[in-house]
């Protein structure tokens, strides 16, 4: 069995095994335990009462967090005409059609979000093997295939997070940075859970939000007392 590092021992000594933490207390503890030299992301994992093997119980969507994620988001948009002008005005970093596709085929993939208008999917369809594995393929279910590309760009820049249940029925996403005020982190998580409840699959039975766990990039996961969340 591998030995714990000095940092791991220090962290383990401050965490109560089996405890469900008040959200604000958990956020404060994660900040205290963050000793790395970069600004860590604060992530949440939500265990849902779904069977991900059933297609009608796969939860996939996007939520605009009220306080964003603290990350600078680069957005590329496939569209043309007036929609292209609107996308640029909304803050898109790159807008194009075949020219943008050629750049991506050449390896220029320095984007966090790729958006497309429906008429551009004939071009985007060629990029499935490039964008798909990177989680960048536009999809109407998360609002990245839309005629209103300007709003999609604004949402992405404002800190919209996209998520999908994994094979264990858990969604994972970033909800901010260690430097965020605990109340802002809490409101971001509450917005996410409210959205998850809104899109609850009709066939899901029993407890839907089973567990909420908060963590940092390099830190431990703390189970949250859901009674401390206003959802």
From Swiss-Prot:
Molecular function GO labels: rRNA binding; structural constituent of ribosome; tRNA binding
Pfam families, A to Z: Ribosomal_L1
Keyword terms: Repressor, Ribonucleoprotein, Ribosomal protein, RNA-binding, rRNA-binding, Translation regulation, tRNA-binding
UniProt protein name: Large ribosomal subunit protein uL1
Family in the record: Belongs to the universal ribosomal protein uL1 family.
Species assigned in the record: Pseudomonas fluorescens (strain SBW25)
NCBIfam families reported for this sequence: rplA_bact
Function: Binds directly to 23S rRNA. The L1 stalk is quite mobile in the ribosome, and is involved in E site tRNA release. Protein L1 is also a translational repressor protein, it controls the translation of the L11 operon by binding to its mRNA.
Record lineage: Bacteria, Pseudomonadati, Pseudomonadota, Gammaproteobacteria, Pseudomonadales
Gene3D superfamilies: 3.30.190.20, 3.40.50.790
One GO CC term on file: cytosolic large ribosomal subunit
GO terms under biological process: regulation of translation; translation
Top-rank taxon: Bacteria
Self-association and partners: Part of the 50S ribosomal subunit.
């Amino acid at each position: 069995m591998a030995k714990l590092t000095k940092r791991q021992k220090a962290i383990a000594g401050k965490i109560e095994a089996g405890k469900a933490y008040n959200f604000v207390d958990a956020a404060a503890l994660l900040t205290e335990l963050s000793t790395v030299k970069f600004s860590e992301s604060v992530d949440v994992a939500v265990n849902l009462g779904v069977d991900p093997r059933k297609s009608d119980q796969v939860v996939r969507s996007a939520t605009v967090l009220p306080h964003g994620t603290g990350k600078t988001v680069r957005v590329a948009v496939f569209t043309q005409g007036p929609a292209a002008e609107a996308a640029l005005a909304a803050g898109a970093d790159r807008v194009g059609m075949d020219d943008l596709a050629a750049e991506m085929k050449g390896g220029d993939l320095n984007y966090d979000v790729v958006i497309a208008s429906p008429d551009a999917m004939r071009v985007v369809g060629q990029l499935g093997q490039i964008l798909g594995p990177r989680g960048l393929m536009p999809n109407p279910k998360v609002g990245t295939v839309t005629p209103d590309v300007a709003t999609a760009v604004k949402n992405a820049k404002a800190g919209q997070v996209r998520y999908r249940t994994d094979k264990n029925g858990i969604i994972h996403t970033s909800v901010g940075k260690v430097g965020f005020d605990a109340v802002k982190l809490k409101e971001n998580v509450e917005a996410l859970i409210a959205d998850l409840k809104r899109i609850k699959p009709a066939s899901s039975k029993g407890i839907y939000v089973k567990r909420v766990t908060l963590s940092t990039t390099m830190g431990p996961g703390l189970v949250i007392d859901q009674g401390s969340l206003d959802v």
